[in-house]
């Protein structure tokens, strides 16, 4: 998930350099969304992994 976010961030930067404003904005938005979703998934996995063992 973070790999995809970095990929779209690089696409956004490259598009911004070459002047494709619409594409840069869209790619940056996708990168932000994927980063937040990935971060939420990591936090959920950290919380779920700390359950006490059931006897």
Curated annotation (Swiss-Prot):
GO CC annotations, alphabetized: plasma membrane
Membrane disposition: Multi-pass membrane protein
Keyword vocabulary terms for this entry: Cell membrane, Membrane, Transmembrane, Transmembrane helix
TM annotation in the entry: 1-21, 28-48
Nucleotidyltransferase in keyword set: no
Subcellular location, record wording: Cell membrane
Highest taxon above the source species: Bacteria
Main location: membrane
Pfam families per record: DUF1328
Alphabetical list of HAMAP family matching this protein: UPF0391
Recorded family membership: Belongs to the UPF0391 family.
Record protein name field: UPF0391 membrane protein Tbd_2772
Protein source organism: Thiobacillus denitrificans (strain ATCC 25259 / T1)
Organism ancestry: Bacteria, Pseudomonadati, Pseudomonadota, Betaproteobacteria, Nitrosomonadales
């Amino acid at each position: 998930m973070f790999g995809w976010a970095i990929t779209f961030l690089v696409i956004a930067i490259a598009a911004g350099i070459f002047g494709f404003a619409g594409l840069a904005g869209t790619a940056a938005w996708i990168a932000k969304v994927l980063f937040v979703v990935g971060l939420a998934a990591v936090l959920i996995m950290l919380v779920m992994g700390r359950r006490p063992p059931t006897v």
